[in-house]
A protein has these predicted regions:
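Residue-level recognition of conserved structural "scaffold" positions that shape functional pockets
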Residues: 10, 121-123, 147
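Amphipathic, positively biased hydrophobic alpha-helical segments used for protein targeting
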Residues: 29-31, 125, 151
Length: 156
């Protein structure tokens, strides 16, 4: 991460909080996919860096390539937030899913592995600062429940 904040993040499994699920449709009712939230190690006094990836067009159990991605970077406890404000600045090059648990019919948990990059910065919503997340890769947990938020919209 470079810009208003210069950091090299190298978080390990036990240090991270990770959860994910279906991404709600966007304004055009077409931008679905998954949302993955990854919180880094506790930095004391309620401070933690959290990255939220909104990956468009990903369906339950299916791999993806070149998926447009919205990225939000939160500095919890510091009142700082950066966002790409759309999925046109970052891309997930490759995403794989492996079912790890079935909780009930139409309710499953997947291990998701993703790798990608950003060509444009995330901007602070209040101060005009910018940061560029040059590249990222992560593995996390995504839970799909008995709903259709992750399914592609029906064609008219």
């Amino acid at each position: 991460m470079r810009g208003a904040v210069d950091l090299d993040l190298d978080w390990k499994n036990a240090q991270m909080e990770c959860e994910g699920g279906p991404r709600p449709p966007g304004k055009d009712n077409k931008s679905n996919g998954v949302r993955v939230s990854i919180g880094g190690p506790d930095r004391g006094k309620g401070r933690r860096i959290r990255l939220v990836f909104g990956i468009a067009g990903v369906e339950e159990g299916k791999d993806a390539r070149a998926a447009p991605t919205n990225v939000t970077i939160l500095f919890e406890g510091e009142q700082r937030l950066f966002a790409t404000l759309g999925d046109d600045k970052c891309t997930v090059d490759s995403l794989t899913q492996q079912r790890v648990e079935t909780l009930a019919p139409n309710h499953a948990i997947y291990r998701v592995e993703a790798r990608g990059f950003c060509l444009g910065p995330a901007t602070s919503l209040t101060k005009g600062e910018r940061v560029l997340l040059t590249s990222f890769d992560f593995a996390g947990r995504v839970e799909f429940d008995d709903d259709d938020r992750h399914a592609l919209p029906a064609k008219p």
